[in-house]
Amino acid sequence: MNIAILDYSASEVRLIKNCPDSWKEEQIEEYIYGEDGLDLSESSTYYMYGDAVSIKQEEYKP
C-alpha cells in the first residue's frame, strides 16, 4: 500500500511506498500524526492511501 500526503506547512507532497497492506485507518493515522511516525500536524495535511496511489508530475500547457 502507498500513502500520498499533501503537507501544506512544508509545501510538499510525499509518497510513502510499501506500507503494510494490513494497516487500518487508525494505524495509518498513527504513522502520519504520531510521535513515533512522521509526527505531522493533522490541521495542515491531507492524505490518501491505496495500492494504486501515485504522483503524476505535469508541465503547464497554455
PLM region spans:
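Short, mixed-charge low-complexity intrinsically disordered segments
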Residues: 29-62
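N-terminal acidic leader/helix
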Residues: 1-31
